[in-house]
Swiss-Prot record:
Keywords: Copper, Metal-binding, Periplasm, Repeat, Signal. The lineage of its organism: Bacteria, Pseudomonadati, Pseudomonadota, Betaproteobacteria, Nitrosomonadales. CDD domains: SMBP_like. Sequence repeats lie at residues 27-33, 34-40, 41-47, 53-59, 60-66, 72-78, 79-85, 86-92, 98-104, 105-111. The keyword Manganese does not apply. Is capable of binding multiple equivalents of a variety of divalent and trivalent metals, including Cu(2+) and Fe(3+) but also Mn(2+), Ni(2+), Mg(2+) and Zn(2+). Is able to bind up to six Cu(2+) atoms. It is proposed to be a metal scavenging protein that has a role in cellular copper management in N.europaea. GO terms for cellular component: periplasmic space. This is Metal-binding protein SmbP. There are two separate and distinct copper binding sites, a high-affinity site and a lower affinity site, which display negative cooperativity.
Length: 117
């Protein structure tokens, strides 16, 4: 009985630690993808390519929202807001403003990997 209880506790603790690792790596992977696509959005925005800026900003937003659901912090939330603003302004043809918002999103998303508030 005592051995069985110890095995159950050990298995539970192991499962807890493994799930925490998956949780953390899922958040990080989505933030990394969000940053990658936001960087592409900025690069295209600087070239005046509105359609490509929008494509990458939308993909970045998808990953930023997934990162938020996986335990993102306030920086992820700010990044999401800037991506939404980038998309809004891009759709209105304001490529310069959209590019600035995409750049702000990158800064917040990168900061989210270093701080937990």
């Amino acid at each position: 009985m005592k051995t069985t209880l110890i095995k159950v506790i050990a298995a539970s603790v192991t499962a807890l630690f493994l799930s925490m690792q998956v949780y953390a790596s899922g958040h990080t992977a989505h933030v990394d993808e969000a940053v990658k696509h936001a960087e592409e959005a900025v690069a295209h925005g600087k070239e005046g390519h509105t359609d490509q800026l929008l494509e990458h900003a939308k993909e970045s937003l998808t990953h930023a929202k997934a990162a938020s659901e996986a335990g993102g912090n306030t920086h992820v939330g700010h990044g999401i807001k800037h991506l939404e603003d980038a998309i809004k302004h891009g759709e209105e043809g304001h490529v310069g403003v959209a590019t600035k918002h995409a750049q702000e999103a990158i800064e917040h998303l990168r900061a989210s990997e270093h701080k937990s508030h």
